[in-house]
Amino acid sequence: MISLRHTALGLALSLAFTGQALAVTTIPFWHSMEGELGKEVDSLAQRFNQANPDYKIVPVYKGNYEQNLSAGIAAFRTGNAPAILQVYEVGTATMMASKAIKPVYEVFKDAGINFDESQFVPTVAGYYTDAKSGHLLSQPFNSSTPVLYYNKDAFKKAGLDPEQLPKTWQELADYTAKLRAAGMKCGYASGWQGWIQLENFSAWNGLPFASKNNGFDGTDAVLEFNKPEQVKHIALLEEMNKKGDFSYVGRKDESTEKFYNGDCAMTTASSGSLANIRQYAKFNYGVGMMPYDADIKGAPQNAIIGGASLWVMQGKDKETYTGVAKFLDFLAKPENAAEWHQKTGYLPITTAAYELTREQGYYDKNPGADIATRQMLNKPPLPFTKGLRLGNMPQIRTIVDEELESVWTGKKTPQQALDTAVDRGNQLLRRFEKASKS
């Protein structure tokens, strides 16, 4: 009898523990962070899981931003969407117009978590805020601005002051010629050419990218990046390209690897590229602001963000949404947001994270680490330098890439390429406008 009782008790305990294990709510989180950035995402998830044993955040790398967005939407249509989907900033209008999301402010409200939306830096939060309700639709996560990375050792070899980086595009052209003359195979390369050379070039120099305040004021916006200032800028890059001073190495972040491998002396890339540069560069490097056009009065203005936010997908149960809310709240805590900023180079997305980082002396110990924030806050944004909210923007970026490539290969002039990009892009905007009204 005693043996049977012990067996029954053991079985009951076993079932109880099994039940507890099964009670863990698994929360898939699809993202596009690879390399050192992916390791930081995994670290955040592990720390949350340890502190919240009832939930398990499962980060899954699903490819680059475009691939992740496509995979997420496709999965939603088949009923297999993740709970959390990281979407890059130009996918915002697409996500807003979809029926695939549950706004984050509703997620927090339903979970009974008092979440202060005002904690986010306004210029970041504004990108993901619903104009009608004034609430966040997605949560800012890895926001960035383009910055200029430069090889201080290469500068010294070329007889350039390693503490004096080029401030204007005209100066950058002069620097690249000297760097090439000193033996560098590549004087300058750029990542994310559409985002940096047109979207941010326009904002940084106080120019609209599209009408209707870059789409924030309506879906009937038209593209306007084929004006004389933008054409002149692309023409300058093309002249550098012909001389071999500017190297086109790819549409995404390929220039970062070319930089930290020592092939290119300078690159404009995401501030979020700092994590990989810090890990792999074997030389002294510096970080500076994006160049501006010396001939444009009032420049520089302010940078607009890139990177991505976290969207919550529809169709999940209450317990999953509660876990999602707790995880998003965890990410926004000052100590976690500050650590993410410091380890990756992405912007501090909350005011508290910025203040904590400053109080810790991080900016004093790491000169240049605050460049991305300073660019974003350089001047109060104009109505058309707050960012972009244009439908089908991922596809428009692809068009821009194709047309700029036609310039670098000598098939089109800068004016022809930008005119064509605007015409093709406007066709996509009209399709989005029509679909959004149906």
Swiss-Prot record:
Q: Where in the cell is it found?
A: Periplasm
Keyword terms of this UniProt record: Periplasm, Signal, Transport
Q: Which residues bind sn-glycerol 3-phosphate?
A: 65, 89, 144, 270, 307, 346, 397
What's this protein's family per the entry? Belongs to the bacterial solute-binding protein 1 family.
Q: How does it assemble?
A: The complex is composed of two ATP-binding proteins (UgpC), two transmembrane proteins (UgpA and UgpE) and a solute-binding protein (UgpB).
Entry function: Part of the ABC transporter complex UgpBAEC involved in sn-glycerol-3-phosphate (G3P) import. Binds G3P.
Q: What is this protein called?
A: sn-glycerol-3-phosphate-binding periplasmic protein UgpB
Per the UniProt record, the source organism is Salmonella choleraesuis (strain SC-B67)
